[in-house]
């Protein structure tokens, strides 16, 4: 059975004319992406928002747009600037966790601004939740310029400007159990596990663990899931939400991610699958640190 889900979280809304911060906490963007970033700027202005770009968007040497401390400082400047009403990260890759020691979590905790990012920003989003209890949105705003840009733009504007819920309305199906309730943590499985053994990993107790992945076939997923099991995550959580696992699905890998997960967890642990969140350009959003109730 496929049902629709709206996660019912109230996020800080934006208004026409609001300034939003655009930055890259992870890998710098390739210079060849400049035209895409300019298109994104135009779309955001058409929606009615005023994007303010970090000085560290594009890579300078190798993957780096700036040092970890410099990238963290930009994020904190956006939090401190009262004219900036929302913060959107457009990067991904590998190096976002480097900024974590340089963030002022007290300022973040007391800010009404919502942070948006995906993939490698899983590290920042979960660290912010662990340190502050503050929710963030797992979503890539660059989706506004890709294959499904028309629908993405409609859903984004409906949710962020018009106080709708389209961006968070998901299709799902239970593959185990029929009900789950809890605060959502997680994101990209590889990036979440960078936090293992650090002060930034959220507590798994009674949480709903969301997982997705872009790269990796059976061997990598088996490794990641084994690590989560050895961390005790599967004994503590109240449910699992599986997003898309792009390479696994494209390669039609067997066993599937669903089978791998079910082999690692108790038979009474609820598991939900959604095709709507992950690295696809049609992906929607989920709030990490937000409470969610799902029923078959």
Show which residues each predicted segment covers.
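ATP/NTP phosphate-donor binding region
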Residues: 8-83
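Buried hydrophobic positions in well-ordered alpha/beta secondary-structure cores of metabolic enzymes
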Residues: 22, 87, 120, 192, ...
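ATP/nucleoside-binding phosphotransfer catalytic cores, i.e., glycine-rich phosphate-binding loops
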Residues: 244-296
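Short internal beta-strands
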Residues: 53-55, 117, 237-244, 272
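Charged helix-capping and loop-helix junction motifs
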Residues: 36-37, 67-72, 223-228, 253-260
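Active-site histidine-anchored catalytic micro-motif
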Residues: 64-175, 293
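Glycine-rich phosphate/diphosphate-binding loops and the adjacent beta-loop-alpha structural elements
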Residues: 209-210, 214-215, 239-250
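ATP/pyrophosphate-binding catalytic subdomain of soluble kinases
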Residues: 153-229
